[in-house]
Design a protein with these regions (language model features):
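N-terminal loops that bind phosphate or other acidic moieties
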Residues: 1-144
Length: 144
């Protein structure tokens, strides 16, 4: 099973982890690391390295980050380039996190990356778009 390290600015990681646990329960091979305003790049690097050491990395590690180009993304990317079998996904939302935590057992790192990007795109929509899609595809009884 792929291991997941979730990281992001402020309380992003711990907040997403809390929401995930509320819906899916406790998950193995998963660590959330916040990057609060009082932290530093060096400290985040150390925390991510420690997380890698704690996880079973045999099947690979996926870093899920909040923002392209942000410190958590850059640090995760640097570490991933040093360790074969690592992937970095950015722009993480709750739908992506939930779906991919459930799917990761049967996926390689590359398959995870491709599926996560599709999931993230699918999860970003609007009420108008969903109502239009549902009007075309769904029987009246079904709803969104």
């Amino acid at each position: 099973m792929l291991s997941i390290i979730l990281t992001g600015h402020g309380g992003f990681a711990s907040g997403m982890e809390k929401a995930m646990k509320q819906i899916l329960g406790e998950q193995s091979q998963f660590i959330a690391i916040d990057f609060p305003e009082t932290s530093s790049t060096a400290l985040l690097t150390s925390q991510l390295e420690e997380a890698i050491a704690q996880l079973d990395c045999e099947d690979g590690i996926v870093f899920l980050t909040d923002l392209l180009g942000g410190t958590p993304f850059r640090v995760a990317s640097t570490l991933a380039m040093q360790k074969p079998g690592c992937e970095v996904i950015t722009g993480t939302n709750l739908q992506l996190l939930l779906e991919m935590v459930l799917e990761r057992e049967w996926l390689s790192g590359e398959e995870f990356r491709v599926q996560a990007l599709e999931c993230g795109h699918r999860g970003l929509t609007s009420l108008v778009d969903e109502l239009g899609r549902c009007h075309e595809e769904c029987p009246v009884e079904e709803g969104i």
